[in-house]
């Protein structure tokens, strides 16, 4: 019997393998939040993610969050489209009201 496919829903945080990278792109396997719409994620083999970090300088495009008892930032300035094969395992989720308004402001 097949195990169910992961949901890949907007707001979920996953461990994501971001290597290989170029230049100043965020690298290594790290937590990242899925920011692409859930219906798009169900239809495509890719998702759009924003990496999370605990080591950063505050910027307007980097909302502060606490995830798994660690203070950090969502790097909305490092958005990437990644194949779902880069998603290692789910970790939890972050409510949209913590980050979506900042993303919408960036894209307007």
Where do the protein language model's features map onto the residues?
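Conserved functional hotspots at enzyme active or ligand-binding sites that engage polyanionic ligands
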Residues: 1-108
């Amino acid at each position: 019997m097949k195990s169910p496919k992961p949901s890949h829903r907007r707001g979920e945080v996953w461990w994501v393998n971001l290597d290989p990278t170029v230049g100043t792109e965020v690298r290594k396997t790290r937590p990242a939040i899925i920011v692409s719409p859930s219906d798009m994620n169900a239809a495509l083999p890719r998702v759009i993610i924003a990496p999370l970090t605990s080591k950063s300088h505050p910027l307007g495009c980097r909302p502060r969050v606490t995830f798994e008892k660690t203070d950090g930032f969502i790097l909305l300035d490092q958005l990437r489209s990644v194949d779902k094969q880069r998603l290692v395992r789910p970790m939890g989720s972050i409510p949209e009201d913590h980050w979506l308004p900042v993303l919408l402001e960036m894209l307007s």
